From Swiss-Prot:
Mediates zinc uptake. May also transport other divalent cations. GO terms for cellular component: plasma membrane. NCBIfam families: PRK04201.1 (NF003243). Zn(2+) binds at E140, H165, E169. The chain crosses the membrane at residues 5-25, 38-58, 75-95, 125-145, 158-178, 190-210, 212-232, 249-269. It is found in: Cell membrane. Fe(2+) binds at N137, E140, N166, E169, E198. Keywords: Cell membrane, Ion transport, Iron, Membrane, Metal-binding, Transmembrane, Transmembrane helix, Transport, Zinc, Zinc transport. This is Zinc transporter ZupT. Belongs to the ZIP transporter (TC 2.A.5) family. ZupT subfamily. It comes from Lysinibacillus sphaericus (strain C3-41). HAMAP family: ZupT.
Length: 269
């Protein structure tokens, strides 16, 4: 178990640090490769949706039906699944639209923002975006950590998928802060800090959830994780992938992500 805990923390840290990668891309490239980003985000959504519905939801149902019986266990699984969706939806609800990490940002936005825009406003926008992404990343950290504790292979897949979708979030933080301050280091630091919410989520899961991890608690948490992952995929990843490129690339990425996840689960059984 100790080895799994260390791996789980490492995976959440890896996923969170991808926001810093996004800010570096914004600073050191002149154009956004929208086709690649669309394909990658679609792939990330495919991995998340497939592993959530085929692996995580099923494990949650098995744990709850074993503990509560078939009928009660299945109802509790459904409640946990949609409870996870409601949880992440409420987080999104209270994030201001201008700071929402769902808003697509491009590297070109660094040069596209007009100089007459108030710099204080841009700075506030960047800080609010960093806070919003931090809040948004917190439950993702819990989800990645708990998945890795139960099955490291599933945890690795989820961490990679989360890392991919954290890259454009890093761009969303760094663009307004860089333009407001002209300071790459400050923009990178705030982007980096927003990503640390994921390992903080993992730490909370370890300290508050792990000591009480009965079969019922495990099943409810895993059902909630599945709901969170599916909601993020449908509400964030796929729409963003389609906005980056309006062809079928996002759907090809989605199917590819599902296929890779399906094959890897079979090979790793």
């Amino acid at each position: 178990m100790d080895g799994n805990v260390l791996l789980a923390f490492g995976l959440t840290l890896f996923a969170g640090l991808a926001t810093g990668v996004g800010s570096l891309i914004a600073f050191f490239t002149s154009r956004t490769n929208t086709k690649f980003l669309s394909l990658a985000l679609g792939f990330s959504a495919g991995v998340m949706i497939y592993v959530s519905l085929v692996e995580i939801f099923v494990k949650a149902k098995d744990a709850l039906t074993n503990a509560l019986g078939n009928t009660n266990g299945y109802w509790m699984t459904i409640a946990g699944f949609f409870g996870g969706m409601l949880f992440i939806a409420l987080i999104d609800k209270f994030i201001p639209k201008s700071s929402n990490p769902h808003e697509v940002k491009l590297v070109e936005d660094v040069n596209a923002i007009k100089p007459q825009v108030n710099e204080d406003h841009l700075m506030k926008m960047g800080i609010f975006t960093a806070l919003a992404i931090g809040i948004h990343n917190f439950p993702e950290g819990i989800a990645t950590f708990m998945s890795a504790i139960n099955d490291p292979n599933v945890g690795i897949a989820i961490a990679i998928a989360v890392a991919i979708h954290n890259i454009p979030e890093g761009i969303a933080v760094s663009v307004p802060i860089f333009f407001a301050t002209g300071n790459r280091r400050k923009a990178f630091k705030l982007s980096f800090l927003s990503g640390l919410a994921e390992p903080v989520g993992a730490l909370v899961a370890f300290l508050l959830l792990m000591p009480f991890l009965t079969d019922v608690m495990f099943g409810i948490i895993f059902a909630g994780v599945a709901g969170i992952m599916v909601f993020i995929s449908l509400d964030e990843l796929l729409p963003a992938a389609q906005r980056y490129d309006e062809t079928h690339l996002s759907m090809y990425g989605l199917v590819g992500g599902m296929a890779v996840m399906a094959i890897s689960l079979v090979l790793l059984v």
